[in-house]
Each structure stands twice: as C-alpha cells, then as structure tokens.
Amino acid sequence: MRRPIIAGNWKMHMTPSEAVKLVDELIPQVKDAKAEVVVIPPFVDLTEVNKVIQGTNILLGAQDMFWEEKGAYTGEISPLMLKEIGVKYVVIGHSERRQYFGETDEMVNKKVLSALSHGLSPIVCVGESFSQREEGKTFEVVLSQTKEALKGVTHDDIVNVVIAYEPIWAIGTGKTATAKDANEVIKAIRNTIASLYGKEKADLVRIQYGGSVKPENISELMAESDIDGALVGGASLVASDFAKIVNY
C-alpha cells in the first residue's frame, strides 16, 4: 500500500518568524494525519522550521538544490547543506524553475541523481502548458519529462522518488484538472515507470497531483486510484486550510 504524501510548497513566502508561527499553528492540527506531511519553506526558513517540527509527524522539504556538493556556484545550495539541517525531501523541476530560471530536463535529471545519492527523496515535477494541452500533447510532454528526469535512476532508488504531476495551466490559476483527468495522466506516468522498472516497483512509487489543490477539491482527487497525495501551493500558507487538505 502506498502511503499518501501531502506536501506544502510555500514558494517565496514566509519570513523565518512567519514560518515558525505557521508551523506552530499547523502541528496540533495534523498530528493524527494518516498521510505523510511535508512542509517546504524557503531556504532561509529551513533551520528554524526544523527546530519547531522536531518530535512531530511533519517532515522537512526544500524547494530546489544544486547537483554539486560544493564549489564556485554563487547563490546555490548543495545536498550536503540540506541534509545537515534535517531536510528529507527536495522539489526538483518545478514549472516555475523551468519557466523563470531556464531549468532543462537535463538539469532536472542531474539534480534527481544527486539528491538520491545523498539520501534525499526528490519530488520531481512534471506537467504540460495550456497550449500543449490544447494541442493534445499532454501525455507526450509529461511522459517525456518523466523519462528524462529518471535517466540513470536505479531499480533500488526509484521507490525513493516521488513524482508530482502539476499541469502548468492549473498552478495558481484556480483551474484544476478534473480528478478523473489527473488520474488518467498519473496512471500513464505509472505505466511509464513500469515499462522502465517493472510493475512491482511502479506500484510502490508515489505520484501526487498539484495545481490549485484546495480543501474543497482534495477528497475528490484522493478518491482516485492512482493519486497518492498532493503538492499544495497557496493553500499551504494558511494552517487551517493545509490541515483540512492533510486530513482529507
């Protein structure tokens, strides 16, 4: 049985003091959650948030990382740094990284391999744009991104990878793929993983949906057979909203 994973990506929100306040509010509201709960604050908040979540059921994620351990890469953060401050999950290839910072499939793949080699679980984001969807290219785009991201990932490591299907047209727009549509794409992603790693492994990989996930639509999404959780954006910035999603 795959344990659902619900992660809150705070993006570029919350100063360290605001982050601590948010997590303090969240802890009692999610303590009985059946799903795995992950918060993903900005880098500067990670240390403070990690102190607050010690001894709770909340795990720590980071929004990105570089693939090298150290070096002359101004502005970058390495997997070693993240490990030392208690990070367990790293979002890789978010559409905003691809769109604003020129991240390519090749860069995403390097980051995935580096994260795994340092014992971090990547949350690998894939998803199509509105125009790609209109042109009927959803499956082509998403499955290509999935294959590229997983190049070189071993049969042992694939179970430590989480995939997040985030249609770009649904992020922050209030538009959501229907639960049925999302499940179809996620099922195709799982079948692609099965073609690379076998069905047994593919059935262990958790695949989330992301894109305007809210308390109002989470139960419908989670009722689908292949959706194993959610990567939540805006709704994760309000403790009560995120708790409702976690406790769907």
Curated annotation (Swiss-Prot):
Keyword hit for Repeat: no
Entry similarity comment: Belongs to the triosephosphate isomerase family.
Domain of life: Bacteria
Gene Ontology terms, MF aspect: triose-phosphate isomerase activity
Keywords: Cytoplasm, Gluconeogenesis, Glycolysis, Isomerase
Gene3D superfamilies (UniProt xref): Aldolase class I
Chain's gene name: tpiA
GO CC terms of this entry: cytosol
Listed EC numbers: 5.3.1.1
GO biological process: gluconeogenesis; glyceraldehyde-3-phosphate biosynthetic process; glycerol catabolic process; glycolytic process
Catalytic reaction annotation: D-glyceraldehyde 3-phosphate = dihydroxyacetone phosphate
Catalytic residues identified in the record: 94 (electrophile), 166 (proton acceptor)
Pathway: Carbohydrate biosynthesis; gluconeogenesis; Carbohydrate degradation; glycolysis; D-glyceraldehyde 3-phosphate from glycerone phosphate: step 1/1
Protein task: Involved in the gluconeogenesis. Catalyzes stereospecifically the conversion of dihydroxyacetone phosphate (DHAP) to D-glyceraldehyde-3-phosphate (G3P).
Pfam family of the protein (one): TIM
Protein name per its UniProtKB record: Triosephosphate isomerase
PROSITE patterns for the chain: TIM_1, TIM_2
Self-association state and partner proteins as the record states: Homodimer.
InterPro entries (alphabetical): Aldolase_TIM, TIM_sf, TrioseP_Isoase_bac/euk, Triosephosphate_isomerase, Triosephosphate_isomerase_AS
Subcellular localization, as worded in the UniProt entry: Cytoplasm
Keyword Transferase: no
